[in-house]
């Protein structure tokens, strides 16, 4: 989705992805995610999924992708980020990813005025975000969700 948005708005993107347990390309193709994509967009999608881990690669002239094969807790970066999409499984499935410590890590990884977005809308998760300094906002949900959450790093 980031690639498609960047392409449409002519943005240059340095996209970093953290995956501890990546979906194999054989499973990704079964999701039929690319059914509405152009042929060129399908090529880019498969190129992203087949890219080597832990190494940046220009997917297109304006889209650099680095996939990090590690746990979020282990991830370190000298760079600060504008946006973090936090798409972990729910707090009931992966409670270790919804703690104050994890939100503190993401807060520290964001630039001032950076944004964290998640499909989760759980009350305790929002309290954890607020506790570490996020300005928390509830938003209308996407992809069939009733509500989602945005955290702003306002310093």
Enumerate the language-model features and the residues they cover:
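A short helix->loop->beta-strand "cap" motif at the edges of active sites that frequently abuts
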Residues: 11-13, 109-114
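Core SAM-dependent methyltransferase catalytic element
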Residues: 132-155
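S-adenosyl-L-methionine
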Residues: 27-78
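Short beta->alpha hinge that forms the Motif I/post-I loop of the SAM-binding pocket
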Residues: 19-20, 98, 121
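A short SAM/SAH-binding and catalytic strip from SAM-dependent methyltransferases
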Residues: 82-96
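SAM cofactor-binding core of SAM-dependent methyltransferases
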Residues: 1-46
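Conserved beta-strand signature within the Rossmann-like core of class I S-adenosyl-L-methionine
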Residues: 83-86, 112-120
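A short glycine-rich, Lys/Arg-flanked "PGG" loop and its adjoining helix->strand segment in the class I
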Residues: 96-112
